[in-house]
A protein has these predicted regions:
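Metal-dependent phosphodiester-processing active-site neighborhood
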Residues: 1-123
């Protein structure tokens, strides 16, 4: 268990069988990281590029900043504090959402690499 400011996180570790993957030598995928387009990727096997939209992260951060400013102003007026439990919970929820987005994006890239038997990833 990992204690956080407002909750506990339980991490489960388990072993699984790793299957060998046949890859094509000299095959690669190139990733271009950005803001509006979080990842733009193209490989030399399918030559079909794909884009992972990054506007979701911008939206999460914009909403977080809006609520944070509101809660900070209320906390400063009412009890002259800069950080409260509500702000801690808000920060934790933002962290969870961004972590979930990153996990889904990396999973999509890995599935593409397995599907097209990619040997190298270039960032």
């Amino acid at each position: 268990m990992i204690p956080k400011s407002t909750c506990f996180i339980v991490e489960v570790v388990y072993e699984c069988e790793i299957w060998p993957i046949n890859v094509i030598e000299n095959s690669f995928i190139s990733l271009d990281l950005g803001l509006n387009n979080f990842v733009t990727a193209i490989d030399n096997q399918s030559k079909q590029p794909f884009i992972i939209n990054g506007r979701a992260i911008k939206s999460i951060n914009q909403f977080y900043n809006k609520l944070k400013a509101n809660y900070q102003s209320k906390a400063k007026i009412s009890n002259n504090k800069h950080f409260t439990k509500r702000l801690a919970k808000l920060s934790l929820m933002r962290e969870f959402k961004i972590s979930n987005f990153m996990h889904k994006a990396s999973d999509l890239i890995i599935k593409c690499c397995i599907k097209h038997k990619i040997a190298s990833v270039i960032i």
